[in-house]
Amino acid sequence: TTSWSLPLSPFMGLHRAPRASCVLRANNDYEAVQAWLSLHEAPATQRAYRKEAERLILWAIVERGVALSSLATEDAVAYRAFLRQPSPRQRWVGPAAPRTSAEWRPFAGGLSTRSRAYALSVLSSMFRWLIEQRYVLANPFAGIKVRGARQATLDTTRSFSEGEWKLVRTVAEGLEWSYGWQ
């Protein structure tokens, strides 16, 4: 069996921003992630985001031996591969079980392409927010994509026509002249 009761380390991660500039009261990565989760009021969203954040925190500590705020781009690339096929399986994969059970595992199996893309998107969003709060200096997940994942398509049915753009430009030019804008 695997023991998931890992002590929370308050030590400074390698990519933590200077404490004086941080706008969070978080003393460690876990508290910073909890602050991020508290932004999301919908219980289903909180559960989904917590699952992704906790999986990453566990992986960072157990497999890489580092804090969340010490992750580098190379770690994020390795995590992307890990999501495809979590290993060692006996540590990471198992049937559904209560989180309090010794049989609980973070994964039921490898994630689909879509699920991997979702996980990386959530984690990148979390790191963007942590940067905005000046908790960390960089987003290790920035630019990391999942091959084969569908990209969002541009909805051209909701765009301005050529005539509408002409009207917008005419009004904008009038505002510039009226208010002396350059």
Regions found by a protein language model. Name each.
Residues T1-Q182:
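Conserved catalytic core of the tyrosine transesterase superfamily
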